[in-house]
């Protein structure tokens, strides 16, 4: 009899065969599923605590996606030869998995849940993120935890005007769209995408296509649960204290209504804190007077939050002004300034209402490109975008240091939005780094980074294909009534049902990110949101074009200049030298940065034009071929009885025979030449062994012949 109760489900999904397994590996976890798609294999595990910690007032879900280097047949680098801190890709994939799972846990469920996905085997053509998301969903489904899933996921490409389900990496390279969508049987929960200026209807079509196709995976998970699922947890939410609810509402509602008439964020936040504190204090006072135990602050805080949401959502659905006084379609006031910082290569200050980004662009050489050692192989990134949001941006204190998951995710979204409009490496040979410093935040700071990033790039002289702008949309949905909000505030994001970010140009969408907190978002609602987002985007693009018509034609004086020359690939070793000695001396002596590609393209960069010209000249000399008939200014290296050895180019010498120095007979060569003397010579012969014969008297004869020729009338 086997130790294992192994359950396997296999199904065809588009062009791929998928295998789900449970019951053999990681049996002590609450749930564990292995997903295998064409040799990309992941193990997804879930462990849930049986009870919540005392005083817990939020849902502690953590998702960790971990890539093992052995999965690609590699040994990790570094001194310890083992996996270290999560890479940016692992962090982004962890967020991608977390986002559709989190909304499906019931309200009031505060038990700690940890989802861990290990990548065990990798087919370089099959990205591991979709198997990981399917695996996490399946592991939660079989675990018995209170989870309103399962979730399905799909990647969609757009090749030759057709949608492609779960494309290979080669297909993604040829695609104008890379979109990941996740959802349940009835609703879309999450979208993450990058596109090449595609129209809104194509983007929405991709979301709908992906949602339809993921049903195959959801059906397979249901079958796996029927045969191998654990008993469902007997979890019930804590009963609501209706009397406490009524008393909190009685005490706080008038004050909360007054707070939400305050348009300034800081003043409103201060008033809300006062309401929370006063309500808790009053309840404690009443409990002491009655000789009872006061309700804990977490419970009171949750009631107040629900009351806030009810007030704000009701006002918007009833057609009243939003928190800051706007209607649903108005974008906050925009201020733009470029060239903000004097010695950076490009900079812009983009302010939209109470959200502000100081964005800086820096140009570098090929040597500044980021080298990424991924499971599928090493590659280079010439465009980097980093997003930082310090605590002072929201008027708070907090930790300052390495970027958090949110900052990495926002930076990647802004990068996706801009990359489609960057010039190619052939058109603009620089590596580019953009840093967005969020100096104020009240909603949509990632989209401010897109706008500011585009402006900073143009200020740096990067020839962008078009202006790129981004906008964040929100949604309030109650029954059949809904309102789509343009350019949402932080509070509206917090209290609303959807965060929907769209970036693009006047011609189409370049990035789309959607996180939906509820079920019931229809295709029609998404159509309205996309149309309203386009309206807002076009407004912002107009403001950007008024401020900056196009890219600067001149680079900053502090940016490196570049020249490119082509050499014979066989000469690359001559330029590099033994152990890099020649190229090291070249860069140090000329103050330049030199990059050589395998095809013989040499890029020389420097802020000093004279040093760049000198480096170019020396490389051309090193790689030049000696040609018969050419005249060279050489240096006498050594005198012999029968002639002199003359250096023509670095590493290239020739023989000036004693009979080729002058026309008359030379008795003593020392009467005509000295070692170290500069001498002009002509190449008269080379042989198959590379030996070179030179002549000085040939030049004397040519000069005499020209002198004897009478001038033409």
Swiss-Prot record:
- For Mg(2+), which residues are the binding ones? 493, 499
Q: Which InterPro entries match?
A: ExoRNase_PH_dom1, ExoRNase_PH_dom2, ExoRNase_PH_dom2_sf, KH_dom, KH_dom_type_1, KH_dom_type_1_sf, NA-bd_OB-fold, PNPase
User: What EC number(s) would the UniProt record show?
Assistant: 2.7.7.8
Pfam families found in the cross-reference section? KH_1, PNPase, RNase_PH, RNase_PH_C, S1
Tell me one GO molecular function of this protein. RNA binding
Q: Which GO terms describe its cellular component?
A: cytosol
Question: If you read the UniProt record, what top EC class would you report for this enzyme, in one word?
Answer: transferase
The family this protein is said to belong to: Belongs to the polyribonucleotide nucleotidyltransferase family.
State the name under which the record lists this protein: Polyribonucleotide nucleotidyltransferase
């Amino acid at each position: 009899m086997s130790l294992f109760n192994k359950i396997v489900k296999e199904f065809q999904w588009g062009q791929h065969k998928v295998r789900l397994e449970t019951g053999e590996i990681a049996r002590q976890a609450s749930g564990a599923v292995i997903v295998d798609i064409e040799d990309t294999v992941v193990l997804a595990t879930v462990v849930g605590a049986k009870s919540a910690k005392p005083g817990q007032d939020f849902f502690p879900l953590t998702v960790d996606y971990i890539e093992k280097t052995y999965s690609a047949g590699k040994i990790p680098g570094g001194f310890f030869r083992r996996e270290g801190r999560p890479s940016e890709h692992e962090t982004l994939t962890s967020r991608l998995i977390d986002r559709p799972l989190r909304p499906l846990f019931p309200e009031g469920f505060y038990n700690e849940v940890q989802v861990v996905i290990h990548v065990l085997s990798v087919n370089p053509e099959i990205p591991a993120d979709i198997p990981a998301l399917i695996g996490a969903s399946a592991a939660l489904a079989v675990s018995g935890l209170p989870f309103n899933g399962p979730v399905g996921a799909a990647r969609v490409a757009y090749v030759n005007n057709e949608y492609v389900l779960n494309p290979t990496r080669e297909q993604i390279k040829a695609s104008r769209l890379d979109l990941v969508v996740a959802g349940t049987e009835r609703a879309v929960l999450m979208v993450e995408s990058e596109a090449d200026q595609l129209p809104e209807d194509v983007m929405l079509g991709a979301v709908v296509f992906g949602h339809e196709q993921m049903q195959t995976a959801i059906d397979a998970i249901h079958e796996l649960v029927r045969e191998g699922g654990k008993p469902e947890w007997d979890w019930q939410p804590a009963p609501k204290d209706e009397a406490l609810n009524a008393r909190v509402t009685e005490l706080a509602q008038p004050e909360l209504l007054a707070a939400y008439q305050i348009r300034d964020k800081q003043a409103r936040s201060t008033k809300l804190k006062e309401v929370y504190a006063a309500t808790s204090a009053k309840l404690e006072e009443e409990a002491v007077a009655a000789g009872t135990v006061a309700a804990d602050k977490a419970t009171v805080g949750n009631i107040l939050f629900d009351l806030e949401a009810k007030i704000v959502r009701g006002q918007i659905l009833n057609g009243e002004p939003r928190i800051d006084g706007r209607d649903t379609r108005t974008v906050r006031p925009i201020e733009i300034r470029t060239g903000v910082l004097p010695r950076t290569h490009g900079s812009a200050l983009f302010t939209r209402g109470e959200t502000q980004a100081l964005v800086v662009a820096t140009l570098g050489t090929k040597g500044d490109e980021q080298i990424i050692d991924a499971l599928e192989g090493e590659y280079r990134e010439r465009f980097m975008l980093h997003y930082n949001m310090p605590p002072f941006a929201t008027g708070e204190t907090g930790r300052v240091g390495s970027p958090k998951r949110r900052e990495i995710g926002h930076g990647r979204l802004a990068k996706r939005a801009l990359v489609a409009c960057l010039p190619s490496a052939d058109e603009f040979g620089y590596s580019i780094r953009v840093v967005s410093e969020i100096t104020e935040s009240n909603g949509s700071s990632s989209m401010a980074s897109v706008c500011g990033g585009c402006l900073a790039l143009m200020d740096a002289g990067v020839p962008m294909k078009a202006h790129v702008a981004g906008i964040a949309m929100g949604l309030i949905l109650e029954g059949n009534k809904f309102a789509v909000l343009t350019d949402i505030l932080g509070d509206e994001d917090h209290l609303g049902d959807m965060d929907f970010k769209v970036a693009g140009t006047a011609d189409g969408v370049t990035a789309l990110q959607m996180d939906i907190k509820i079920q019931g978002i229809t295709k029609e609602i998404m159509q309205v949101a996309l149309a309203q987002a386009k309206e807002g985007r076009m407004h912002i693009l107009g403001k950007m074009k008024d401020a900056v018509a196009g890219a600067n034609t001149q680079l900053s004086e502090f940016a490196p200049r570049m020249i490119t020359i082509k050499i014979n690939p066989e000469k690359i070793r001559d330029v590099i030298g033994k152990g890099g000695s020649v190229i090291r001396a070249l860069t140090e002596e000329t103050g330049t940065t030199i990059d050589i590609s395998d095809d013989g393209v040499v890029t020389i960069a420097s802020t000093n034009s004279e040093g760049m010209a000198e480096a170019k000249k020396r490389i051309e000399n090193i790689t030049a071929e000696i040609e018969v008939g050419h005249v060279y200014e050489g240096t006498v290296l050594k005198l012999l009885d029968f002639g002199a050895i003359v250096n023509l180019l670095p590493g290239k010498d020739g023989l000036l025979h004693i009979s080729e120095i002058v026309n008359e007979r030379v008795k003593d060569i020392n009467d005509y030449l000295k070692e170290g003397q500069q001498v002009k010579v002509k190449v008269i012969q080379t042989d198959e062994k590379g030996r070179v014969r030179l002549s000085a008297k040939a030049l004397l004869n040519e000069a005499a012949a020209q002198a004897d020729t009478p001038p033409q009338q």
